[in-house]
Amino acid sequence: MPSFNFLKEAKVYIIYSGNQYNIDISSVSFSQTFTENSYSVKTLHNQKNVFDGSIINKANPANFEFTFPAIKDSDFVTVFNLLVDYEGFTNKLNTFDLYISTELDVFKIETCVITNGSFVIEKSRPLSLTVSGEASKLSYFGAKSDVTIPGSVQSRSATMRYNTNPVVTATLDSQALSNIVNVAVELQNDIEWNPYTTVHQALQVTSANNAMYPTDFVLKNRVLSGSIQRYVTERKGTIGASSNALALQSWDTSAPIVITAGEGSGGSFRGFSFDGNCSFTNRLGTGSVFTQSHDWRLIDNPTNLSSIISYTTGA
């Protein structure tokens, strides 16, 4: 009877700076495709050759995505840092290798870079973070019983402490927002892979083993944005008014924004926080209950983005 790889058995390991981090996940996906080019094989003497030939010598960047819980302990903070931080004093993002292991097989994804991070902030649901990205190469590493995932294994906390009932607060343009329905925050890292195809390399390709794979990239742009959805109540607010509700259908090109999502307060706070300056627009939503959404985008350019976004953990 054949053995199978089951998603529910999948475990994710990040290898970064020689260390191995086991990341608990609720979902994971990964893939890589190859570019196929066709060419005509029809000739004057073979008019029935109407099916084109094929050339495959180039791999597209691999893709991956996984979701992990934003617990109160520091077990998974490395993933957050890989999303946010630069590589040293450069403007490049950090790269890492990813291993996905089932009870049967192990798969390896090389030179990974996180291109998107979606902060899952919902009332009555534990905080979590979904990251997705691109990579150089996906390959089969081997049978689990035959291979060893590299890296110095990092210890884990004895118990997992979840942010099970996060308290969400938001201040926009120095006004505390009430009647919040939900909050969405997303960080996008726009990268572009350097050209990696040459005529010489193309002529040498004989299989997926020596195909042309992307190797390096540049960071083109970063966008931190989100929305704060609230119920429309009797307190509408007016433009320029010092109330706790901003005006409907208003906007601003420069306003301070502070969002926190987590448990505890002061030095005991554990969770996500966002503190910077943004532009925003306000739009009305006409569902069964009327809502308004403040759609915002960061306009600051800090030396370190971690001064704007933080994931606070601790005992």
Annotate each language-model stretch with its function:
Residues 1-315:
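Signature of extracytoplasmic/envelope-associated structural regions
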